[in-house]
């Protein structure tokens, strides 16, 4: 491997990590006035599905059922989610987003969209497509 390639890989990895850190920190600040990121992700899934089993949410996020239970307990206490048990199988627990939760997701998605529009305004559509293509190769 050439020394130039090694330098390029080092610079690329540094830039990618810096980009992700910046995006994560900025989104965290934007969402800080609402709810934490992990709660938002669960709400977003429930907003899409409206009602979902705890196990399916956990599988989609690749986390344990107990983690989802802990996160949703906070969302329930805030009035964003309700929990119910299946009438046919008491082991099955469903989560459902409330109207208040739907409103919050809409506000947060709007704030995120505005941030991303500003953040990526320096890139053309072609440049964004190139970045998407490259990032898919690395994932």
Where is each model-derived feature located?
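Pre-recognition alpha-helix immediately N-terminal to the DNA-recognition helix
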Residues: 18, 41-44, 103, 130
């Amino acid at each position: 491997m050439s020394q130039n390639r090694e330098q390029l890989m080092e610079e690329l990895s540094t830039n990618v990590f810096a980009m992700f850190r910046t995006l994560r920190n900025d989104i965290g600040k934007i969402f800080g006035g609402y709810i934490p990121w992990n709660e938002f992700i669960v709400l977003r899934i429930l907003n899409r599905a409206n009602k979902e089993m705890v196990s399916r949410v956990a599988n989609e996020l690749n986390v344990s059922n107990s983690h989802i239970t802990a996160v949703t307990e906070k969302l329930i206490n805030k009035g964003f989610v309700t929990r119910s048990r299946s009438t046919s199988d008491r082991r099955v627990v469903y989560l459902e987003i409330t109207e208040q939760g739907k409103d919050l997701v809409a506000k947060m998605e709007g704030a995120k969209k505005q941030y991303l529009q500003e953040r990526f305004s320096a890139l053309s559509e072609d440049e964004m497509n190139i970045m998407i293509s490259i990032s898919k190769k690395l994932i």
